Amino acid sequence: TLDNIDYNRLNMSNVERIEIVKGAASSLYGSNAVGGVVNIISKVSAEPWTVNLNGRYGAYNEQRYGGTIGFNVGKFNSVTNVQHTQVDEKDLADGKTNEETEDWAFKKVYGDKTWNFKERLVYTANDHLKLTARAGYFFREREKSQTSKDRYRDFSGGVKGNYVLDKDKDLEIAYSFDQYDKSDYLPQDANDVRDYSNVQHSVHTFYNHTFVGKHILTVGGDYMRDYLMSYQFANN
């Protein structure tokens, strides 16, 4: 639905690289990947222990603080990332408030604050089996006015298993969950009213078979359950 892609959910401090895959790739990335895929690959801990702390301060009281803790010990590999940001509102209309201008939606950038938590744990049982689990939580509050604040939340998680049958064959099974909510917070009575919720459950599996060392046949399938409740729908 309109205006419901929240790029604030992306924590770029935890990104190792970005891949762009052109063309249809439904067998690898699900039925929605009909025109191409943008893969955002998160960092992997290569050292036994790693700690990274970062911060930034800019105009309009823009602040960003974050940290990453990772370890790679025995059969376990883990990366935990936390980030907090905040910024004051920016008036783009020479001092006029949004209510005083006709095209008010483009005259002010509201201030907001965010919290972002990510965890990924990988367990390599042996040369054939690898299990991956991930979880995340995102919260953003936008200072729309003194009587109302916009709140955005996201809960995500997933598990994945990779099994190598032999050097030419491997199998992957994965489940993922994502719930993105919007609500209006009314400070005067501490009331948080949810008016948007998008919940997705997805399961996919695929099998790869390599021929003559370079030709790969991939067979797979996926199932998705998508629930949407929105203020943009009548009587919803």
Locate predicted features:
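Hydrophobic, lipid-facing positions within transmembrane beta-strands of outer-membrane proteins
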Residues: 36, 49-51, 63-67, 115-119, ...
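Outer-membrane beta-barrel domain signature, especially the mid-to-C-terminal portions
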Residues: 5, 93, 104-109, 148, ...
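Face-selective signature of the C-terminal outer-membrane beta-barrel domain
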Residues: 79, 122-139, 152-236
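Transmembrane beta-strand segments of Gram-negative outer membrane beta-barrel proteins
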Residues: 16-17, 42-57, 77-78, 171, ...
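Transmembrane beta-barrel outer-membrane domains
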Residues: 8, 31, 58-62, 108-114, ...
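Periplasmic-side early beta-strands and strand-to-turn transitions of outer-membrane beta-barrels
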Residues: 27, 39, 47-48, 56, ...
